[in-house]
Structures are given as structure tokens and as C-alpha cells.
Amino acid sequence: MILIWLSIFMLVFIMLTLGMFVNKKVSLDREKSSPFECGFDPLNSSRTPFSIRFFVITLIFLIFDVEIYLLLPMVYLNMSSPTTYLIIFFTFILVAGVFYEWSEGALSWIK
């Protein structure tokens, strides 16, 4: 089994090394790197602005989604199980983090 994984690793390594040597070198010019709009300079920036508040709300939602995922199996666990104490400790850390973010003002939408 180890021989199979070693041979796969070596094959991938050889292919990547050969790809680096065979790869056509491309010189980056300003004209080649810029977007093309009918021969004129672009009117707008290609980057769209993104509010960091939406990103923070998304992260908080993701964290508490994982918390719910961990809390659902607690219905079937024995309350004296070490896993139960670990999940309760993890939940306590998450709730303490939310209170800290709230006290710092990161959760207030309008300042």
C-alpha cells in the first residue's frame, strides 16, 4: 500500500517538474494584462467594492452554524460523557466570543 502511494506521489512530482520546464514563459506586459474594451481604456474598475460588515456577519453565521451542528447530537449523548463537556466548553467559548464582539461594537450595523 505504501509503495502504491509513493509511486503516485513520485508520478505527480515528475509531472509537475516536467510541466515547469516545458511551460511556455509568458512575459507580462501592461497591454496584455489590462482588460480590453474596444481599444479604449476601461471606464470602470474591474474590482467591485465589498462591505466588510457583510463578511463579518457571514463569518458569525458560519461559526454558529457549526455550533448548531455540534449541539444537535447532544440530544442522544449521555450527559456524563466527556464529549458532552467538550461541546459545552466549545459553546461557552463561542458565546463568550460573541459577547466580546458585541462589546467591541463589531456587531452594531450603524455607527
From Swiss-Prot:
TM regions (residue ranges): 2-22, 54-74, 82-102
Cellular component, GO annotation: mitochondrial membrane; NADH dehydrogenase complex
UniProt keyword Cytoplasm present: no
Keywords from the named record: Electron transport, Membrane, Mitochondrion, NAD, Respiratory chain, Translocase, Transmembrane, Transmembrane helix, Transport, Ubiquinone
Membrane topology summary: Multi-pass membrane protein
Annotated catalysed reactions: a ubiquinone + NADH + 5 H(+)(in) = a ubiquinol + NAD(+) + 4 H(+)(out)
UniProt EC number: 7.1.1.2
Protein task: Core subunit of the mitochondrial membrane respiratory chain NADH dehydrogenase (Complex I) that is believed to belong to the minimal assembly required for catalysis. Complex I functions in the transfer of electrons from NADH to the respiratory chain. The immediate electron acceptor for the enzyme is believed to be ubiquinone.
Source taxon at top rank: Eukaryota
Organism: Artemia franciscana (Brine shrimp)
InterPro entries documented for this protein: NADH_UbQ/plastoQ_OxRdtase_su3, NDAH_ubi_oxred_su3_sf
Family membership: Belongs to the complex I subunit 3 family.
Subcellular location: Mitochondrion membrane
Protein name, as recorded: NADH-ubiquinone oxidoreductase chain 3
Record flagged with keyword Secreted: no
Matches recorded under Pfam families: Oxidored_q4
GO MF entries: NADH dehydrogenase (ubiquinone) activity
